[in-house]
Amino acid sequence: MYYGFDIGGTKIALGVFDSGRQLQWEKRVPTPRDSYDAFLDAVCELVAEADRRFGCKGSVGIGIPGMPETEDGTLYAANVPAASGKPLRADLSARLDRDVRLDNDANCFALSEAWDDEFTQYPLVMGLILGTGVGGGLIFNGRPITGKSYITGEFGHMRLPVDALTMMGLDFPLRRCGCGQYGCIENYLSGRGFAWLYQHYYHQPLQAPEIIALYDQGDEQARAHVERYLDLLAVCLGNILTIVDPDLVVIGGGLSNFPAITTQLAERLPRHLLPVARVPRIERARHGDAGGMRGAAFLHLTD
């Protein structure tokens, strides 16, 4: 059995998957915020409960926001303060007497989608998250590409390309990002960026769901806004695709629930790609909230 943990600032979610990649059991508990020992106990107790329930010693994978293992072997995860700065992988591997694998939550999202029954035919899968921020991951032959610093797939911290500034206007504001840089694309393409663009052009502070509701009602202003957003997304994604050249792009995050994102994007991409490039298949994520657990569990699938 494959045990997958999706760990965030408020909850520890465990999903148990069988050899057919089907979810058999899941359980959630609150994430301890202050005590590392309590955090380790919470994870180990869930593993012990799963072992008893299924009568086996399942493999353990964990998806967590941040950098799963720094140069000194410790976790960096600002949203999980009880475990940040601690040698989480080594400590859990020792306590559970098995190989525990960690990856960041964006890679786990991408891995979950790459192992969807319909998507396993594609060697190179790119996961793109358009949510509170912009992120994602790359999966090659069923394995995540992490890079030395676990930042592969941090697409949101690419800066706006020149052709985006040409399209939006050379006086378009380069907003300061939380990473400290200016002009990172997540400030324009995330859910918050979607709302910011609307306010920038129309001087109305609406949230993304409100704008999308207006779009669905045929509001001309909202429709013009969506056209502009999709054009900007296509420009930025075109730059990424020229480097990555995936077979499949799977889009997750809150904005993936807006059908125009996946249905109207492909037709805008060719003019931003090399003439010989083929547009990848573009799909909405299939596994929703379970994706983090699935991807974490599947860190062991290619053993």
From Swiss-Prot:
Annotated Gene3D superfamilies:
3.30.420.40
Q: What is catalyzed by this enzyme?
A: N-acetyl-D-glucosamine + ATP = N-acetyl-D-glucosamine 6-phosphate + ADP + H(+)
Q: Where is the signal peptide?
A: none
SUPFAM superfamilies the record matches? Actin-like ATPase domain (SSF53067)
Say which enzyme class the record assigns: transferase
Question: What are its E.C. numbers?
Answer: 2.7.1.59
Q: Which cysteines are joined by disulfide bonds?
A: none
GO MF term (any one): ATP binding
Single biological process term from Gene Ontology: N-acetylglucosamine metabolic process
Instruction: Note one Pfam family from the annotation.
Output: ROK
Q: Keywords, A to Z?
A: ATP-binding, Carbohydrate metabolism, Kinase, Metal-binding, Nucleotide-binding, Transferase, Zinc
Read off the InterPro entries from this record.
Answer: ATPase_NBD, N-acetyl-D-glucosamine_kinase, ROK, ROK_cs
Q: Which PROSITE patterns does the UniProt entry name for this protein?
A: ROK
Any idea which positions bind ATP?
4-11, 133-140
Give, as in the UniProt entry, the pathway in which the protein acts.
Cell wall biogenesis; peptidoglycan recycling
Q: Where Zn(2+) is bound, by residue?
A: H157, C177, C179, C184
Function of the protein: Catalyzes the phosphorylation of N-acetyl-D-glucosamine (GlcNAc) derived from cell-wall degradation, yielding GlcNAc-6-P.
Family (UniProt): Belongs to the ROK (NagC/XylR) family. NagK subfamily.
**Which HAMAP family does the UniProt entry name for this protein?**
GlcNAc_kinase
Could you identify this protein by its name? N-acetyl-D-glucosamine kinase
Q: What organism, scientifically named, is this protein from?
A: Escherichia coli O6:H1 (strain CFT073 / ATCC 700928 / UPEC)
